[in-house]
Each structure stands twice: as structure tokens, then as C-alpha cells.
Amino acid sequence: IVFNFSGVRNFDYNKLQKDIFSSSYIKDVYRNIVLDDSAISFVVELKENVDYSISEYKEPGYMELKLFNKNEEEPKNVYFIRSKAMENGEPLAMIAEIYFNEDATVVKTKNGLYSVSIGEYSSKEEADKALETLKNREDYNDELYVDSCMSNENPK
């Protein structure tokens, strides 16, 4: 689950991260670098067979994240467009910003680095076609490529 908040210059991410990690449903929580000093973005990775709901309230304003068990699902192979793996920092944030309208997100790789990921496709052909569309953009980053992994795993 990717959370993006704007206008939160004094947001206490460390406290929130600690609170989220207290749940047995959580696999990982990590911050995404955002090129706006009044915004914050972070990812909450859920363990297998966990589902969620998010509710937003006002007066007072807050969000509620509910986590619960869901029916066991068989992991499947998924395809996606991605950048190379790198440290979480400004270069990664710049790639994510370029592809913001394609719902790009930063994901942690198996080796602890990070990658920008775009889309989720059921076949390599479908992902290749989407990558070809991106290649026609003027701002295309030529380091993107199609990759795959099991739906319950992080990419390589």
C-alpha cells in the first residue's frame, strides 16, 4: 500500500513506522524519497493473505487502516516495467516523478535496494507492449525494462 501526503512538513514518520510495525500483519514499511519538502510518501508491505481497508474521516481529520486475514490465494507470476535497482534517493525519486501519471511506485528489491515499478501485467507480451508505449515519450528513461516475479515476492 503506497501512502502519499502533501502539506505535512512536520509529519513524524518514525513514530508512524514504529506503530505500523507493531502489527503482526506487516512485512515491511519504508519511506519513499519525494522531491517536495512538504510531502511524504511511504510503502506498507503486507504479509501473505492479508487484506486491508482504508477509511478517511474529518473533524477531526484522520485515516484508519484496518488489516485482516483474507482467503488464501495461490501466488501468480506477474510482469511489470521497472528501473534498475539503486539506493533510495533523489535519482530514484526523479524516475518515479517522470512516470507519476503511470502510477509508478518505488518498491524494495530482494537485496534491499529500490526500484521504480510501473504496472502489473498478466503476460510478458502485455508488459512489452506497455513498455513500447513508454519508449515513444520524449522523457523516456532508456533504463526501463520488463521483469517478473511471483505476486508474493519482491523483485530481484
Stretches with model-predicted labels:
Residues 88-114, 120-156:
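Extracytoplasmic
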Residues 1-99, 103-111:
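Signal-peptide-cleaved, periplasmic/extracellular N-terminal interaction regions immediately downstream
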